[in-house]
């Protein structure tokens, strides 16, 4: 995978044409997934378990790639006169009638190219014309050429795919839950619910679970030293429990492990956890009961404990919670092209909190920029901080990365286990971008284009 767009470089992308994926794939049940994973693990025992964990999605996975042993057939060639103008420097007039997504098929392209370009068209949506005033005519001409803007495809006037699904926010992708105060204690009230989750607006919803009616659950954010009371009402038809992952408890009965530190929370029951947030850092909360199913279906969320004085300085913040069970490979409960891009202006520093709530390791690779890793599992690394462009995050781990944007462009940002990000229909799943613009005002322009 290469940079999707770098205004300083004329290189083409890997995929240059698009058509949406079929929505007729059946849903995958967690028991089915668990059986496959168990059998696969047994078959590969003795050194192959890692390979099993990193295997591609099953053929009938709702949002995974569709396996095919047959080669991709080339589409019929078309005459040069029927091809769109590759030198377009502006989007076609709004009065022009949009043609079907994908447009005329250039010679030599396959259905893979068609689908792949459509995914990127959906990801950028009406950001594409907005980028003209940000990157300038020359860079925009290259982007228009890559995406075939002369086709006047429908996505040019539609919001990006991530703005069409619920529970996504441009600030940090996960809105914090506002507490109430009770004698100095910060009280957070949440429900544990059965929900329908939209991984992508063009896909059917999946039957999932969520805290506060959403997956991931609302971010619980406090300051080091705060007394925290988390009250959960179980609206499920089954028992559950809630574990605050990474918290150092004075009272181990607050640890949230049914039949170890508590009885399970029964349907209709309200259960309270109370503790002092003694250590700052990027933490998580999730089910710790029937967890393969419940966490895999969405019972997870971020728990951030801010230090009283934060030595880490940054301009913007994002939280990425990865999961790889229900719905395939997701970032914050959504898969590409419905993932929220990281936005930054040249010179700004972005903090990204990686949290792996899945069952597989995911190595996050950022194109064109460097990540400085300043914390692991909530613990500051101090002088042991290191730089990298690929960061492996194991299940249960959290890393805090700083990215100082130095190069304008649309930079790919993805898991580097390739079957988690690309299939026969192009990019999907754990793919995102870092969109770096020349000035801070341009970030505001992008946001305005999305929410207008």
Regions found by a protein language model. Name each.
Residues 306-321, 436-451:
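Low-complexity, Pro/Ser/Thr- and charge-rich linker/hinge segments at domain boundaries
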């Amino acid at each position: 995978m290469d940079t999707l767009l770098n205004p300083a470089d004329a290189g083409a992308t890997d995929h240059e044409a698009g058509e949406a994926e079929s929505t007729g794939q059946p849903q995958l049940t967690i028991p089915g997934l668990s059986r496959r994973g168990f059998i696969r693990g047994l078959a590969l025992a003795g050194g192959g378990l890692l390979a099993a964990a990193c295997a591609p999605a099953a053929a009938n996975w709702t949002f995974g790639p569709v396996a095919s042993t047959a080669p991709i057939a080339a589409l019929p060639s078309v005459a040069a006169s029927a091809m769109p103008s590759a030198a377009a420097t502006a989007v076609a007039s709004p009065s022009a009638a949009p043609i079907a997504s994908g447009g005329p098929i250039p010679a030599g392209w396959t259905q893979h190219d068609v689908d792949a370009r459509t995914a990127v068209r959906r990801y950028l949506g009406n950001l594409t014309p907005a980028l003209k005033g940000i990157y300038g005519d020359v860079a925009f001409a290259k982007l228009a050429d890559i995406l075939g803007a002369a086709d006047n495809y429908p996505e040019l006037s539609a919001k990006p795919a991530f703005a069409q699904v619920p529970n996504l926010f441009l600030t940090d992708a996960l809105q914090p839950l506002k507490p109430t105060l009770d004698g100095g204690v910060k009280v957070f009230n949440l429900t544990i619910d059965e929900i329908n989750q939209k991984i992508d607006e063009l896909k059917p919803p999946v039957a999932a679970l969520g805290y506060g009616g959403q997956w991931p659950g609302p971010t619980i954010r406090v300051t080091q030293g705060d007394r925290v009371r988390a009250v959960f009402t179980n609206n499920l038809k089954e028992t559950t429990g809630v574990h605050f992952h990474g918290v150092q408890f004075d009272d181990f009965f607050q640890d949230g492990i049914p039949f170890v530190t508590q009885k399970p929370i029964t349907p209709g029951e309200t259960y309270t956890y109370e503790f002092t947030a003694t250590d700052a850092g990027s933490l998580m909360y999730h089910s710790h009961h029937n967890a393969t199913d419940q966490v895999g279906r969405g019972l997870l969320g971020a728990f951030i404990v801010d230090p009283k004085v934060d030595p880490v300085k940054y301009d913007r913040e994002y939280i990425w919670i990865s999961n790889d069970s229900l719905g395939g490979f997701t970032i914050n409960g959504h898969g590409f092209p419905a993932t929220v891009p990281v936005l930054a202006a040249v010179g700004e520093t972005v903090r990204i909190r990686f949290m792996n709530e899945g069952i597989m390791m995911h190595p996050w690779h950022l194109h064109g920029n460097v990540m400085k890793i300043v914390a692991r599992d909530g613990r500051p690394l101090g002088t042991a901080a290191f730089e990298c462009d690929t960061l492996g995050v194991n299940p249960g781990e959290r890393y805090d990365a700083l990215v100082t944007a130095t190069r304008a462009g649309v930079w790919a940002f993805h898991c580097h286990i390739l079957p988690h990000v690309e299939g026969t229909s192009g990019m999907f799943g754990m793919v995102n971008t870092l969109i770096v613009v020349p000035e801070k005002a341009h970030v505001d322009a992008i946001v305005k284009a999305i929410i207008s």
